[in-house]
Amino acid sequence: MLKETYHPNAYLANLRNVRRGLRARTKVLNALEKGSGDGKTIAQEAALHYSVVMHHLKLLRSEGIVKRADGKPSVWTLTGAGQKRLVNTD
């Protein structure tokens, strides 16, 4: 059985990490690595529903992984902690 790989920042410290959430956060983080954007753009890039993306963006913001810029529409970007990826050293 193949083990799924998730973005290292998809794991949350204060909440239970279930597979569906890890998958969604991985898609959101991968979309943000390509460039910042508003919730609608990120939802389209990640192929997720807008409300799912917004829920996970708020969770990631509470962990300090993403930040939201002021203005309409709000633009989401990765923070310094969000840009740091773990390197696999096999």
What is the meaning of each model-derived region?
Residues 33-38:
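Short capping segments at the starts of secondary-structure elements
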Residues 25-32, 60:
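Hydrophobic residues on short alpha-helical segments
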Residues 41-45:
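A short acidic, leucine-rich amphipathic alpha-helix
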Residues 81-90:
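Conserved segment of winged-helix/HTH DNA-binding domains
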Residues 61-70:
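A short, conserved structural fragment
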Residues 48-61:
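Short amphipathic alpha-helical interaction segments
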